[in-house]
Regions:
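Conserved SET/PR-domain catalytic core that frames the SAM/AdoMet-binding pocket
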Residues: 53-65
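Non-catalytic, conserved peripheral segments adjacent to functional cores
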Residues: 1-55, 69-114
Length: 114
């Protein structure tokens, strides 16, 4: 991901993601849409990268998105639990500036991706 680019929001119904940023730095935002979860409707941020190595497990029904922060391109690796189904993708999206999730990606007005 290029600096200041935002890729958000999406979630999966079946798939669990396991993500790490191996070069550069990204801000990962998570929004829990799982009814009955103790963290239902909560937002979390995780900064991760080559200087802050973490592996984040993202369960189904948790919206997530990234913003590359810093001056260099960021590289993210994902190891999902499901193979990609081209005929019926397990991916559901919202725009970065959706009103359904009260989160500010720091985008200029009208700009969808930095």
């Amino acid at each position: 991901m290029y600096p200041n680019v935002v890729k958000a929001w999406h979630y999966h119904k079946k798939q669990t993601d396991h993500m790490a940023c191996v070069k550069g730095t990204v801000k990962l935002a998570l929004y829990d849409a799982r009814k009955g979860s103790p963290t239902f409707k909560e937002l979390n941020e995780v900064f991760m990268g080559d200087r802050r190595p973490v592996l984040v497990k993202i369960p189904p029904l948790v919206y997530h998105g990234f913003k590359a922060v810093g001056a260099e391109t960021a590289y993210i690796i994902n190891v999902p639990t499901e193979t990609y189904n081209y005929k019926k993708p397990d991916e559901f999206r919202l725009p970065p500036d959706t009103r359904q999730i009260a989160y500010d990606w720091g985008l200029a007005p009208g700009l969808k991706h930095g």
